[in-house]
Amino acid sequence: MKFVDEVRIFVKAGDGGNGAVSFRREKYIERGGPNGGDGGNGGSVVFVADPQLTTLLDYRYQQHHRARNGEHGMGSDCNGRAAEDMVLKVPVGTLVKDANTGELLVDLSEAGQRWVAAKGGRGGLGNMNFATSTRQTPRFAQDGTKGEELTLRLELKLLADVGLLGFPNAGKSTFISRVSRARPKVADYPFTTLVPNLGMVQYKDGLSFVMADIPGIIEGASEGVGLGHQFLRHVERCKVLIHLIDMGAEGEGRAPLHDFDVLNAELGKYSPELASKPQVVAANKLDLPDAQARLEGFTEALRERGIRVYPVSCATGEGMQPLMDSVAEVLFTGRTEKLHVEIPAKAARAGKAKTKAAEKKALARNAGAAAATKSATKKSAAAKKAVTKKAPARKAGAVAKTSAARKAGTAAAKKAPARKSGTAPVKKAAAKKAPARKSGTAPAKKSAVKKASARKSGSSGKAAAKKASAATKRAPARKSGGGRS
């Protein structure tokens, strides 16, 4: 049977039936009252966890599931028949999620668990329900409601107690076939197992548990290399993980310690919670040549980390019982003492030194980060202050420039009179020199003028004296002449 662990389906509940509009019509009854019946309820879609199923293969090819509708109401007070619910059986451990939002709706992790995914519609009321003392002949009825519909994504997480992890061709299928009745395909090539396999392990004293074998995980599985790590969800419910290491992988260019570190790194990328689960490390294929030599180096490397290694051979069954005893102790009691060993003194000292160095580096990084944050905050504060002070500084600079310009203007104004005053004495001196020059030539002219005036005054004085004497002589004559008359 093909293993399918993820499907997308559409479910729709049935609609409710409509109420009937009917009246009583019988002989000798003239006005019969309303007798329309109610509609039936629609069927719901219900999921049930079935322990007999191990795959979602049935839903891969049938993706639409619709419940039946309720029947309509009829006359003579007859109600419609309600539809039966549609029951969808899924394997135990199925997760039902909303395909649009990815929200987890329910985890069907228990056998027989039921969950109503889509509720059916309610049937409508007939007109007989609307008759009153004032409305004795209602000619209407109520319609049924619609059923719910959803698009769901079903994901299967196998319910196993112990999970088998390892690189491809590490011997996981051989291991589960050795300890249980599971018969997976076993071949000498990688990726023989393409789907998870479950096996029931019968332990001592009637104790039993389920073991899950999943396809191999390789480096880069978180990025889609190989089959990816989509199958890791099948071991998320496991309480214990068995980490199977191939001691014969060096011929393929791999080292056991490298495989161990790579697989744990891929687990951490997928889910830190899964990586923190208890791991039982088993070194497989000890029946191969040179496997014992590789086992010593691998065991010593993990001993320095405090991890115990169980050497086994799945082909011959060597070392299987001590391994299964440790697995059962961790599973049923929760004790993990057998999974660890005492770290050697040198390794412990080296580990302490490494931890101290790592702590110092971490402290230095934290201090550097704190200093960087402080400097960044200081720079940001200084930048903010500079931004706030730039505008006033610019204003002050402008004011200073304007005041300086004004002062320069006043100084220039003051310098202009000074320049004028500086040129004025020159002009005054020139003016003084000009009169001086004029005065130097003026005495000669004045003397000449004085001489001419003296000459004129001398002649004019004589003439004036003559005129005055003549006038005096004439005046008495005029007076006397006037007196005679």
Curated annotation (Swiss-Prot):
Family of the protein in this entry: Belongs to the TRAFAC class OBG-HflX-like GTPase superfamily. OBG GTPase family.
Compositional bias of kind Low complexity: 367-385, 394-428, 437-446, 455-474
Obg domain sequence ranges: 1-159
Alphabetically ordered keywords of this record: Cytoplasm, GTP-binding, Hydrolase, Magnesium, Metal-binding, Nucleotide-binding
Cell compartment(s), UniProt: Cytoplasm
Organism for this UniProt entry: Myxococcus xanthus (strain DK1622)
Keyword Acetylation: no
GO biological process: ribosome biogenesis
Lineage, opening ranks: Bacteria, Pseudomonadati, Myxococcota, Myxococcia, Myxococcales
HAMAP family attached to this UniProt entry: GTPase_Obg
Annotated positions binding Mg(2+): 173, 193
Annotated region described as Disordered, given as residue ranges: 367-485
Cofactor(s) it depends on: Mg(2+)
Gene responsible for this protein: obg
Role this protein plays: An essential GTPase which binds GTP, GDP and possibly (p)ppGpp with moderate affinity, with high nucleotide exchange rates and a fairly low GTP hydrolysis rate. Plays a role in control of the cell cycle, stress response, ribosome biogenesis and in those bacteria that undergo differentiation, in morphogenesis control.
Name recorded for this polypeptide: GTPase Obg
Gene3D superfamilies listed in its UniProt record: GTP1/OBG domain (2.70.210.12), P-loop containing nucleotide triphosphate hydrolases (3.40.50.300)
EC number of the protein: 3.6.5.-
One Pfam family cited in the UniProt record for this chain: GTP1_OBG
Residues bound to GTP: 166-173, 191-195, 213-216, 284-287, 313-315
Assembly notes: Monomer.
GO MF entry, a single one: magnesium ion binding
Signal sequence region: none
Domain OBG-type G: start-end pairs: 160-332
